[in-house]
Amino acid sequence: MTNKKGFSRCGELYIDRLREEGRYSTAHVYKNALFSFSVFCGTCNVSFRQITRESLRLYGQYLYENGLKLNTISTYMRMLRSIYNRGVEAGNAPFVPRL
């Protein structure tokens, strides 16, 4: 069962909204970033608790070791940060300075 307040669900809802607005390319990039992070975490239901400085550092290292370019890594990190910040705004995730 999908957690309605989890990180993955928050990302999916935002991706749906982007598609409804006709922002298909942006939705595609968010979907790729979310999918990649889900694979890294080993679950399609990533929780906000799994988003830590250490997990993001390891994820960046994982992407680099798998041949992704720095531009792609930076883009994916921005997408993840954006999803996390939406969770903070909705009250589903704690604010963590310099996450």
Regions found by a protein language model. Name each.
Residues 36-40, 49, 65-99:
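N-terminal DNA-binding recognition helix of tyrosine site-specific recombinases/integrases
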Residues 2-66, 85:
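Basic/aromatic-enriched alpha-helical hairpins
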